[in-house]
Swiss-Prot record:
This is Tetraacyldisaccharide 4'-kinase. Pfam families: LpxK. Its EC number is 2.7.1.130. Keywords: ATP-binding, Kinase, Lipid A biosynthesis, Lipid biosynthesis, Lipid metabolism, Nucleotide-binding, Transferase. Transfers the gamma-phosphate of ATP to the 4'-position of a tetraacyldisaccharide 1-phosphate intermediate (termed DS-1-P) to form tetraacyldisaccharide 1,4'-bis-phosphate (lipid IVA). One of its GO terms (cellular component) is plasma membrane. ATP binds at T49, I50, G51, G52, T53, G54, K55, T56. One of its GO terms (molecular function) is ATP binding. The lineage of its organism: Bacteria, Pseudomonadati, Bacteroidota, Bacteroidia, Bacteroidales. Belongs to the LpxK family. It comes from Porphyromonas gingivalis (strain ATCC 33277 / DSM 20709 / CIP 103683 / JCM 12257 / NCTC 11834 / 2561). GO terms for biological process: lipid A biosynthetic process; lipopolysaccharide core region biosynthetic process. InterPro entries: LpxK, P-loop_NTPase.
Length: 357
C-alpha cells in the first residue's frame, strides 16, 4: 500500500472544495435536499476517488453473477461522450455516443439495457415506466455514489489497495471527490487490485485504516488477466513467437496493465495517456511511427491496448495501416473476490432484489 502523492500548494483550494462538499452532504443527510426512491432495486457501484479503482470490471463482475437470471439495466453518466441528454444504447452505439465504459459493457452484454444520462433520476424513471416484461429487475448505478439525488438500496464503494484512501486528500491537491469519512455511507466496501500474497496482517491493517462500522462488509478483489488477447480490428490471433509489443493505456492507473504486458512480452514501448483519452491525429501518427520502429526490429511485434482504450481506438480504425490493424489487440481484465467471499457478496445482492419484490 502506497501513500498518495499530495500537491501541497493546492491544499487551500481543497479546503474550499471540502466546505462545499460537506455542506451538500449535510443537506442530503438532513433531508433538505431530497434523494429519490424507486420501485426497482438499485445497486450503486462507485468511488470516493476520481478513478483508478477498476469500477467497470467490478460492474461487469456483478453482471456476470446475476445475468441472465435477472433482467439487469446499467445507468451511467456516459463520461466523455459527445452527445447530450438521455440515450438508450444499442449494439451500434460508439464510445462517442455513450462513452467508452458503457460501450464496453454493451459490447460484452448486448441484451442488457444500458442507458447514459447525466440526470440519473430521469433514466431510472424511464426504466420504471417500461412494460412489465421489459422492466429490469435490478438497476446497476455506475459511478453514482456522489449522485445523491438517487437513493440506492445498496451502496458498494471501491477503493484501491495501492492508494490508501485515508491518507489521500480532497481535490485538487489529491484525488478524493469527498472526504474519506464519506465511506461510512457505504453498505459494502471492496478493496481492489489486491496482490495475490495478501497476508492476514495486511487484512487487519486495511480494516483499521478504513475504520468501517460493524455493519459494513469489507471485501478484497484482485485483477485477473487470464484471458488471451482479443483482436481489435481483425480475427487473427497473435503468434506464439511474439516477444515485443507496443503497449497503449489511457486509464487512471495503468501500472498493473503494463506489468502484465511486460510479463508476456518483455520488449517494446509503453505509451501512457490520461483516463478516457481521445486520441488526436498527431498521437495516432506517433503510434504508427512507434509501430513501424518496433516492427523493423521484430517482424512478429504486436500492438496491445487496454479493453477500455479499445472502445475509443476502434473509432480510429481507418487511420491505422492495414498491417498494423492485423496485429492490434486488447487485453480483457476481470476481477475476482478473494478469500471465498463470493457467496456472501451474492447473498447480499439477492437480498436487495428479493426485498423489493
Amino acid at each position: 500500500m502506497d501513500a498518495p502523492r499530495i500537491n501541497k500548494w493546492l491544499k487551500p483550494l481543497s479546503a474550499l472544495y471540502g466546505v462545499g462538499v460537506r455542506l451538500r452532504n449535510y443537506l442530503f443527510d438532513k433531508n433538505v435536499l431530497i434523494s429519490n426512491s424507486f420501485d426497482i432495486p438499485i445497486v450503486c457501484v462507485g468511488n470516493i476517488t476520481i478513478g483508478g479503482t477498476g469500477k467497470t470490471p467490478h460492474v461487469e463482475y456483478l453482471i456476470r453473477l446475476l445475468h441472465p437470471r435477472y433482467r439487469i439495466a446499467v445507468v451511467s453518466r456516459g463520461y466523455k461522450r459527445k452527445t447530450k441528454g438521455m440515450i438508450v444504447a444499442t449494439e451500434g452505439s460508439t464510445a462517442w455516443d455513450i462513452g467508452d465504459e458503457p460501450r464496453q459493457i454493451k459490447r460484452k452484454y448486448p441484451d442488457l439495457t444500458v442507458i447514459v444520462d447525466a440526470d440519473r433520476s430521469r433514466a431510472i424513471g424511464y426504466l420504471c415506466d417500461l412494460a412489465e416484461e421489459q422492466r429490469p429487475q435490478l438497476i446497476v448505478l455506475d459511478d453514482g455514489f456522489q449522485h445523491r439525488k438517487v437513493k440506492a438500496d445498496l451502496n458498494i464503494v471501491l477503493t484501491d489497495y495501492n492508494r490508501i484512501l485515508t491518507k489521500d486528500y480532497l481535490l485538487p491537491a489529491g484525488r478524493l471527490r469527498e472526504p474519506a469519512g464519506s465511506i461510512q455511507r457505504a453498505d459494502m466496501v471492496i478493496l481492489t487490485k489486491c496482490p495475490d500474497d495478501l497476508a492476514p496482517i495486511d487484512l487487519r491493517a486495511a480494516k483499521r485504516d478504513l475504520a468501517l462500522y460493524p455493519h459494513q462488509k469489507l471485501f478484497f478483489s484482485k485483477f485477473m488477466y487470464g484471458q488471451g488477447l482479443k483482436p481489435l480490428f481483425s480475427d487473427q490471433s497473435p503468434s506464439a513467437e511474439v516477444r515485443s509489443a507496443l503497449a497503449i493505456a489511457g486509464i487512471a492507473s495503468p501500472k498493473l496493465f503494463f506489468r502484465e504486458i511486460r510479463t508476456r512480452f518483455p520488449s517494446g514501448t509503453d505509451r501512457i495517456y490520461p483516463d478516457h483519452h481521445e486520441f488526436t491525429d498527431r498521437e495516432v501518427c506517433l503510434l504508427i511511427q512507434d509501430w513501424h520502429e518496433l516492427h523493423r526490429k521484430d517482424a512478429n511485434a504486436i500492438v496491445v491496448c487496454t479493453e477500455k482504450d479499445a472502445m475509443r481506438l476502434a473509432l480510429r480504425q481507418s487511420s491505422f495501416p492495414q498491417e498494423m490493424q492485423e496485429r492490434f489487440y486488447y487485453l480483457p481484465v476481470e476481477v475476482k473476490l478473494m478469500f471465498d467471499q463470493e457467496k456472501v457478496f451474492v447473498d447480499r445482492l439477492l437480498g436487495v432484489i428479493q426485498h423489493k419484490k
